[in-house]
Amino acid sequence: MIKSELVQRIAEHNPHLYQRDVENIVNAILDEIVDALARGDRVELRGFGAFSVKHRPARAGRNPRTGAHVPVDQKSVPFFKTGKEMRERLNREPGNTDTGA
């Protein structure tokens, strides 16, 4: 599913909202998550999961074509850990679509 499909599904389930408004809301949520991660904050959505940033140190890499050693700079990468409710829902028996609500 891509973002435009997500927006469309949410708009379909909420006919009182315009699709443009749903798109603005989804974009605002994603922007806030990215901004928080850029500040070094952790973003936890209970039942869904938690977003955080992991820092990878500089290291020596290797060019797979030539075999030459190349330096790889340190970098920060986004990390997502699923929440308990999501893991349980994903690991249910096939055919069981009960959402627990």
From Swiss-Prot:
Superkingdom of the source species: Bacteria
Keyword Transcription tagged: yes
Pfam families xrefs: Bac_DNA_binding
A GO-annotated cellular component: chromosome
SUPFAM superfamilies the record matches: IHF-like DNA-binding proteins
GO biological-process terms attached to the record: DNA recombination; regulation of DNA-templated transcription; regulation of translation
Gene Ontology molecular-function annotations: DNA binding; structural constituent of chromatin
Keywords: DNA recombination, DNA-binding, Transcription, Transcription regulation, Translation regulation
Family (UniProt): Belongs to the bacterial histone-like protein family.
Biological function: This protein is one of the two subunits of integration host factor, a specific DNA-binding protein that functions in genetic recombination as well as in transcriptional and translational control.
Assembly: Heterodimer of an alpha and a beta chain.
Full protein name: Integration host factor subunit beta
Species for this entry: Rhodopseudomonas palustris (strain BisB5)
